Amino acid sequence: MLECENLSCTRNNKVLFKNLSFKAELKSKILITGPNGSGKTSLIRSLSGLLPPVSGNIRHCGKDIYDDPKSYISSMVYIGHKNACKDSLTVAQNVEFWAGIRNTRELIVAAICCLQLQPVLNIRYGELSAGWKRRVALARLLISNANVWLIDEPFCNLDSATCELVLNLISIRSEQNGIVIITGHSSTEQLCDFTTIDIRNFNRLLV
């Protein structure tokens, strides 16, 4: 379980949200919604261990993620707006690099096949379209073999077919006792089975 208790976060001395609490049980799919600048990215970065909250606690399996970061990082994968890929490397080299970090080289073929990356494997990442770049970055979900997926706007720059593919991967991960938390501007019909947290509800608590 991933549990947040009374989280507050600031950016440039401005409070983004305050006293935000929720629990993500195994098999959870959670959508964090809100307009640009409302704190969605800051929240998911806090959940990833990259941005300590001003106050409150985040616990994974009962342990504060900031007290035991190594244990948490090994069970979590975070994909932000920046795709964290090297432009000078080919797609294949990027995938191999991630697998080397996670010691999961046995998952390379499955990740390539699931994200249908075969046509671009030998192309430098920097030469790809925005859609292909995002698809390559999402391969990290499978390469990581992580139980917790944190994805900031996963469908950005993707066509409808790839969006459906990613939704299927998310469903499979959650069904396998995973936890998936994503951000988006609003809920849609395709995301109707996600538990929605509107971050604006916690913006209104500011004093």
From Swiss-Prot:
GO terms for cellular component: plasma membrane. Residues 2-204 form the ABC transporter domain. It is found in: Cell membrane. It catalyses: heme b(in) + ATP + H2O = heme b(out) + ADP + phosphate + H(+). Disulfide bonds: none annotated. It is an enzyme of class 7 (translocase). GO terms for biological process: cytochrome complex assembly. It is a peripheral membrane protein. Its EC number is 7.6.2.5. One of its GO terms (molecular function) is ATP hydrolysis activity. ATP binds at G34, P35, N36, G37, S38, G39, K40, T41. Its main location: membrane. Keywords: ATP-binding, Cell membrane, Cytochrome c-type biogenesis, Membrane, Nucleotide-binding, Translocase, Transport. Part of the ABC transporter complex CcmAB involved in the biogenesis of c-type cytochromes; once thought to export heme, this seems not to be the case, but its exact role is uncertain. Responsible for energy coupling to the transport system. The complex is composed of two ATP-binding proteins (CcmA) and two transmembrane proteins (CcmB). Belongs to the ABC transporter superfamily. CcmA exporter (TC 3.A.1.107) family. This is Cytochrome c biogenesis ATP-binding export protein CcmA. It comes from Wolbachia pipientis wMel. The gene is ccmA.
